[in-house]
Amino acid sequence: MTSPRTLYDKIWDDHVVDVQPDGSSLLYIDRHLVHEVTSPQAFEGLRVAGRKVRHPEKTLAVVDHNVQTSDRSQGIDDPESRTQLEALAENVRDFGIEFYDALDRRQGIVHIIGPEQGFTLPGQTIVCGDSHTSTHGAFGALAHGIGTSEVEHVLATQTLVQRKARNMRVSVDGTLPPGVTAKDIILAIIGEIGTAGGTGHVIEYAGEAIRALSMEGRMTICNMSIEGGARAGMVAPDATTFAYVKDRPKAPKGAAFDAARRYWESLVTDAGAHFDREVRLDAANLPPIVSWGTSPEDVISVQGRIPDPSEIADENKRQSKEKALAYMGLTPGTRITDITLDRIFIGSCTNGRIEDLREVARVVGDRKVHEGVSAMIVPGSGLVKAQAEAEGLDKILKAAGFDWREPGCSMCLGMNPDKLRPGERCASTSNRNFEGRQGPRGRTHLVSPAMAAAAAVAGRFVDIREWPQG
């Protein structure tokens, strides 16, 4: 009789090809997602070695990081970005990989197009040369980012050498209050455990509040596992998962789907399985969260005040937080609701899905973007954009004064034309608030889509729980 196993244990065990003398394992990789930034050297390595892509049908490529979100007929001005986009188009053609280019209606952020195409499925091992690959763990998959040399290894062999991580479970019990979302949950978790709290672990998210989330919400949670230091994050698949996956273009059909579902239903943590670390949060006590510093762990309730670093005993941590406040142009004791904003960014692989855009439109209603605030919405994929337009969300948002863009990573990172100017302060639905992340000397506050939408109208942070309806 085998010992009780976690969800992570089960997927790992099902994919071990060989165990090495040093304790590392060779894992079979089910799905490989590729974009333009981390793949050029990998493909060049294949050419130099005279190798082919072992399983092109298990690989899907898309442009997302460098694409402009304005008029795409104008082409790319930045020569490095243009070179990367052209290289990916050439590489996928030469190696026979399916590819969504900038003009394909299925194009979008890699971690949004995988799930919506049914390329992402429960029980799989999924890799991509991108740190937010953990997003796909929302489906009960083992998904994580890899480096460029590993991208080449997976292209050539469909395998990857890995050491098994430790098991960690974060349980969020109870029911979320109105106005509190999946984004607030994950920001609260990172605030609780810190950016190193999950180091060396794969996190399984569990509890009543997690089970109650939609797939979009679960993807938001798993997306930011890396910001909590974890190798990956995952949620056990259930009826919500199966309903989302069914009838997706690349998902199994008919009897094949039924057979797959029977396997997927076994992907739950056994009673009595061991976790190396356990963390519990009470959903009922969670407020809307705003980040105030330059690390995702620098978070506080929207009703809070900027903390005073002088109260921190550890000298290194105190100096780090003092530096963060200086960069952000904030002083201790300032109310979060007194912080005014220059820019609003709604999008990214964290919060660029149709559910997010519906919530933004609901919050905005017939109101207008505050004078002096520049607000942009970047749908996560062409299909998300088309769905939003079919529902009339774009009309609501454009009438309010939002800039309605084409899909891509956009202002989540400063690798394309969408950047903050020095000193600009932005409420962003993305996943990182590092120095310069959204542009040199730009100041980023991480929030939920609802909080960002309300801030766009008010021109400052407001408590979405007090937002008037209609």
Curated annotation (Swiss-Prot):
GO terms for molecular function: 3-isopropylmalate dehydratase activity; 4 iron, 4 sulfur cluster binding; metal ion binding. It comes from the Bacteria. Pathway: Amino-acid biosynthesis; L-leucine biosynthesis; L-leucine from 3-methyl-2-oxobutanoate: step 2/4. Belongs to the aconitase/IPM isomerase family. LeuC type 1 subfamily. Keywords: 4Fe-4S, Amino-acid biosynthesis, Branched-chain amino acid biosynthesis, Iron, Iron-sulfur, Leucine biosynthesis, Lyase, Metal-binding. Pfam families: Aconitase. [4Fe-4S] cluster binds at C349, C409, C412. Its cofactor is [4Fe-4S] cluster. The keyword Signal does not apply. It comes from Methylobacterium radiotolerans (strain ATCC 27329 / DSM 1819 / JCM 2831 / NBRC 15690 / NCIMB 10815 / 0-1). PROSITE patterns: ACONITASE_1, ACONITASE_2. GO terms for biological process: L-leucine biosynthetic process. Binds 1 [4Fe-4S] cluster per subunit. Heterodimer of LeuC and LeuD. This is 3-isopropylmalate dehydratase large subunit. The keyword Hydrolase does not apply. PANTHER family: 3-ISOPROPYLMALATE DEHYDRATASE, HOMOACONITASE, MITOCHONDRIAL-RELATED. Gene3D superfamilies: Aconitase, domain 3 (3.30.499.10). Catalyzes the isomerization between 2-isopropylmalate and 3-isopropylmalate, via the formation of 2-isopropylmaleate. Its EC number is 4.2.1.33. It catalyses: (2R,3S)-3-isopropylmalate = (2S)-2-isopropylmalate. HAMAP family: LeuC_type1.
